[in-house]
């Protein structure tokens, strides 16, 4: 087994249905076709590896798919196709993930640490360090929903680095703090690096990327544009942003519209076919390529969309439930309703024997 990587992402895509409203989502559930709902492919086939002990930076313009990818790696959201392999006895902590708004900072520390597998005595031993690193004062006793984004980031970062994960996913956590906190975080990340931990670091700050990352992946409107040495990829990305800034307002808009249009028009079947052809070209003797690629695409994915069978079953159960309620309310027996379905909307009339109730003979 190849032990050189800690994270391996293969053919990962992410599709979103762009419903205009909840009502449209509901309508599409009951309709036989959802082809009218526009789709958007946030990721269009990403394959990359993060080696054990390396810090991989993710860069790219706004909306390019960095957070989508880091959330998929963290297991926060599922991919639409592809495999995500996280190697070994590994725990991942994503800074922004898992803070519950209704719980206080203190409660969140305990919850996140418990979820990370720590025992209560272990958490008690760490509590002072986590609290002192986060440095958010009395806000610790307030619900997290009252925190500023900087405070959330401080708390999330502090918990993440103290529960000792093998892999740390840091998504834009350093962009919201002040300089002192930023330096504390950089020192902590450097400590992690020295301990040989694996880090995925998402940032718009090329300076931070240059300081912290061994390699960089440039995500560009849902595709992996380039991956390699930090210096090289950052240089190319700087050239791109310089070129983009040099465009007129109209040209910029046109470029962005074109990129988004590509993401809407992405054809997953064509992409799958392309992967099959590439593999066949590499290994012409392999007769099972199509089945292998299908397994790689869909084998480890739980579909977020309901199959027609399940949809039919859900609707049928719903109808049976409503009928059962109506029969119950109508007072008729099931046999009566089956013989005369109209009874269901005509409640049974109960005739009272007035003589019996009044006791008159
Ligand atoms: N739940 C969702 N429904 C529909 N589209 C979504 C959803 N989440 C993300 N997207 C879209 O996916 C694309 C990628 O978003 P993502 O947040 O991953 O980008 P990013 O590179 O992290 O951006 P930024 O640098 O601004 O944080 C964007 O176009 C975004 O609008």
From Swiss-Prot:
Residues 247-361 are annotated as: Unknown. SMART domains: AAA. InterPro entries: AAA+_ATPase (IPR003593), ABC_transporter-like_ATP-bd (IPR003439), ABC_transporter-like_CS (IPR017871), ABC_transpr_TagH-like (IPR015860), Bact_Polysacc_Export_ATP-bd (IPR050683), P-loop_NTPase (IPR027417). It is found in: Cell membrane. It is a peripheral membrane protein. It catalyses: ATP + H2O + teichoic acidSide 1 = ADP + phosphate + teichoic acidSide 2. The keyword GTP-binding does not apply. Keywords: ATP-binding, Cell membrane, Membrane, Nucleotide-binding, Translocase, Transport. GO terms for cellular component: plasma membrane. The keyword Translocase applies. GO terms for molecular function: ABC-type teichoic acid transporter activity; ATP binding; ATP hydrolysis activity. Belongs to the ABC transporter superfamily. Teichoic acids exporter (TC 3.A.1.104.1) family. Part of the ABC transporter complex TagGH involved in teichoic acids export. Responsible for energy coupling to the transport system. The complex is composed of two ATP-binding proteins (TagH) and two transmembrane proteins (TagG). This is Teichoic acids export ATP-binding protein TagH. It comes from Levilactobacillus brevis (strain ATCC 367 / BCRC 12310 / CIP 105137 / JCM 1170 / LMG 11437 / NCIMB 947 / NCTC 947) (Lactobacillus brevis).
